[in-house]
């Protein structure tokens, strides 16, 4: 929990280049986590913005030519300045443009965290996926039958890229190739409003700003899962969204410790 308290105390500046569908919620969730968001995306300013930030998040949702250019500039700036960064592989399982771009970004920018659902992780690893648009395909969902092989794939991808790999879903798997965490927190309603994955990436960017990449990523995923559980007993999805942000802001360390469901593998 030291990472969480450090973020709240230091209020690090987080540069997050994301999509217009979720940008407002992403900025608010970063604020709720205790950090300060800046969502700059113009190619002529992003290097300057990234260079004064404590971490960078890039998100492939609703991709455009300008954002592709900007994310690459920011990613290289972050790498050159040893600023932690996370890439969210939104849609790489259904778009060759995004897949090719993500591979280029990973090769040239060396993100500290590669995050996506299992369809997206399989696609970036080079395995055919059954992605349903930006959502995970039914055949790619982690089950008892494919659990071990998926963990091995995630570990190999981590070792090949040098990045922490975070595969999110009903069960979340986070690995740096040596240490692997399995997280079972969360609820179905997290998949019923748009942008929760993008919001999670904002929290990951906030928590890895300390330089503690594996633990920061795992803590962000735990936090989102638990706050989803706490928020689901509401009238509907609109109320859920607001309750989720409120819980990210107000949850105590004691509740996190009480409700966390995490195992090492």
Curated annotation (Swiss-Prot):
Belongs to the Thz kinase family. Its EC number is 2.7.1.50. Its cofactor is Mg(2+). One of its GO terms (molecular function) is ATP binding. Signal peptide: none annotated. Pathway: Cofactor biosynthesis; thiamine diphosphate biosynthesis; 4-methyl-5-(2-phosphoethyl)-thiazole from 5-(2-hydroxyethyl)-4-methylthiazole: step 1/1. It comes from Clostridium botulinum (strain Okra / Type B1). The keyword Hydrolase does not apply. It comes from the Bacteria. GO terms for biological process: thiamine biosynthetic process; thiamine diphosphate biosynthetic process. It holds the Pfam family HK. The keyword ATP-binding applies. This is Hydroxyethylthiazole kinase 2. Catalyzes the phosphorylation of the hydroxyl group of 4-methyl-5-beta-hydroxyethylthiazole (THZ). Substrate binds at residues 39, 195. Keywords: ATP-binding, Kinase, Magnesium, Metal-binding, Nucleotide-binding, Thiamine biosynthesis, Transferase. ATP binds at residues 115, 168. It catalyses: 5-(2-hydroxyethyl)-4-methylthiazole + ATP = 4-methyl-5-(2-phosphooxyethyl)-thiazole + ADP + H(+). InterPro entries: Hyethyz_kinase, Ribokinase-like.
């Amino acid at each position: 929990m030291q990472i969480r308290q450090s973020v709240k105390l230091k209020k690090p500046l987080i540069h997050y280049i994301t999509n217009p569908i979720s940008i407002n919620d992403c900025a608010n969730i970063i604020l709720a986590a205790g950090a300060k968001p800046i969502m700059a995306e113009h190619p002529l300013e992003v290097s300057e913005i990234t260079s004064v930030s404590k971490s960078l998040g890039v998100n492939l949702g609703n991709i455009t030519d300008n954002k592709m250019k900007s994310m690459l500039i920011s990613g290289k700036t972050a790498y050159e300045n040893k600023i932690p960064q996370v890439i969210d592989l939104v849609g790489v399982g259904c778009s060759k443009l995004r897949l090719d771009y993500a591979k280029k970004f990973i090769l040239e920018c060396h993100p500290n965290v590669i995050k996506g659902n299992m369809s997206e992780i399989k696609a970036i690893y080079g395995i055919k996926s059954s992605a349903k648009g930006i959502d995970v395909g039914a055949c790619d969902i982690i089950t008892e039958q494919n659990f071990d092989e998926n963990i091995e794939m995630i570990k190999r991808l981590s070792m090949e890229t040098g990045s922490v790999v975070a595969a999110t879903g009903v069960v979340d798997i986070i690995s740096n190739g040596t240490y692997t965490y399995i997280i079972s927190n969360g609820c179905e309603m997290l998949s019923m409003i748009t942008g929760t994955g993008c919001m999670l990436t904002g929290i990951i960017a906030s928590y890895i700003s300390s330089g503690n990449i594996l633990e920061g990523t795992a803590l962000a995923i735990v936090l989102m899962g638990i706050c989803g559980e706490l928020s689901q007993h509401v009238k509907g999805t609109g109320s859920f969204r607001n309750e989720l942000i409120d819980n990210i802001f107000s949850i105590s360390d004691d509740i996190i410790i009480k409700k966390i469901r995490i195992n090492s593998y």
